[in-house]
């Protein structure tokens, strides 16, 4: 990073929209709506539907839904339950938009490095999923009390440093064999604002580029590359160190860029209680996904 150029990264379309609005950037094609629910939950929708919007935001066309709940970071049980229900509702809406089947096959992919706590959200989420594909394949849908059970399978592909393969390469092979109707990816994200760490969930129908939030770009996991729709779900667990320094000196008259040390480039900060946070959020995500895919079957097994 040069002394006169730095960039605070974010994976959240909502934060990109806020930055563009603050900078009075041309936002034609960027549509925004917001609704407030009980328990302090805020659901925001950003849609990008023009080439101008793609250039302005640096994001592909599509729909980005953000669920925010400040109490979520505190582990408030009532809030967590409400967010889980809202997540399930939003995911069902995304699934309905990309798949017109009443009974479908879904592949859930937990992206990230299980051995790095802030990045372990995806793998830990998949650990708690209600997996049904093997049972449906072996015994048929009559093995369940509800014959309308969906076929759900999960995968944790690891990271390139562990496997020597791009996640996309692994997924292409799995998708060609399993033939899911759609893929859901779970990944830890990077945020621009500290207030959104651990209490914000983003869903999008555009897929995801693993590692993009921390400047470690890999091949995109999306419809174009996989041949099936990809719904991406993520929660920010880290923030760029440059952002924290920028916020700290923003009120001064100093040139912020000159105060940025090159050593901050590539450095990210995570909350001190990230172990418990990731464990709690992974459970919340898996519960919401199970509810969305269940067709009521999961309720019988979760009691």
What do the predicted segments below correspond to?
Residues 1-60:
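N-terminal amphipathic/basic leader segments beginning at the initiator methionine
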Residues 51-97:
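An N-terminal, well-structured beta->alpha segment
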Residues 66-70, 105-116, 154-158:
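Short glycine-rich or small-residue beta-strand-to-loop segments that form or flank ligand, phosphate
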Residues 111-119, 161, 188-192:
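Gly/Ser/Thr-rich loops at beta-strand to alpha-helix junctions
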Residues 113-150, 154:
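Glycine-rich phosphate/diphosphate-binding loop of Rossmann-like nucleotide-binding domains
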Residues 143-174:
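A structural-propensity feature for long, helix-poor, extended segments
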Residues 155-156, 185-303:
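A structural signal for small-residue-enriched, beta-sheet-centric alpha/beta enzyme cores
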Residues 175, 180-181:
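Proline-aspartate-enriched helix->loop->beta-strand connector
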């Amino acid at each position: 990073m040069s002394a006169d150029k730095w960039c605070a990264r974010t994976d959240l379309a909502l934060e990109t929209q806020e930055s563009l609005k603050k900078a009075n950037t041309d936002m034609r094609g960027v549509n925004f709506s917001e609704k407030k629910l009980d328990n302090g939950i805020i659901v925001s929708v950003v849609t990008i539907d023009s080439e101008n919007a793609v250039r302005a935001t640096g994001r592909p066309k599509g729909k980005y839904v953000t669920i925010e709940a400040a109490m979520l970071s505190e582990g408030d049980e009532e809030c967590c339950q409400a967010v889980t229900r809202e997540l399930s509702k939003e995911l069902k809406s995304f699934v309905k938009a990309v798949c017109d089947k009443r009974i479908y096959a879904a592949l859930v992919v937990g992206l990230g490095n299980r051995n790095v706590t802030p990045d372990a959200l995806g793998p830990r989420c998949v650990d708690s999923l209600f997996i049904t594909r093997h049972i449906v394949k072996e015994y048929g849908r009559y093995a369940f009390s509800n014959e309308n059970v969906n076929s759900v399978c999960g995968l944790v592909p690891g990271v390139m440093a562990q496997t020597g393969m791009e996640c996309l390469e692994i997924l292409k092979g799995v998708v060609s064999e399993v033939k899911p109707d759609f893929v859901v990816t779970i990944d830890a994200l990077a945020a621009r604002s500290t207030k959104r760490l651990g209490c914000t969930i983003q869903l999008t129908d555009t897929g995801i580029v693993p590692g993009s939030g921390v400047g470690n770009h890999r091949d995109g996991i999306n419809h174009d590359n996989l041949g099936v729709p990809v719904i991406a779900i993520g929660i920010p667990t880290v923030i760029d160190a440059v952002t924290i320094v920028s916020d700290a000196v923003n009120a001064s008259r100093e040139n912020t860029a000159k105060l940025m040390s090159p050593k901050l480039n590539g450095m990210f900060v995570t909350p001190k209680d990230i172990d418990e946070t990731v464990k709690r959020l992974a459970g919340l995500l898996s519960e919401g996904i199970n509810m969305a895919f269940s067709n009521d079957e999961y309720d019988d097994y979760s009691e």
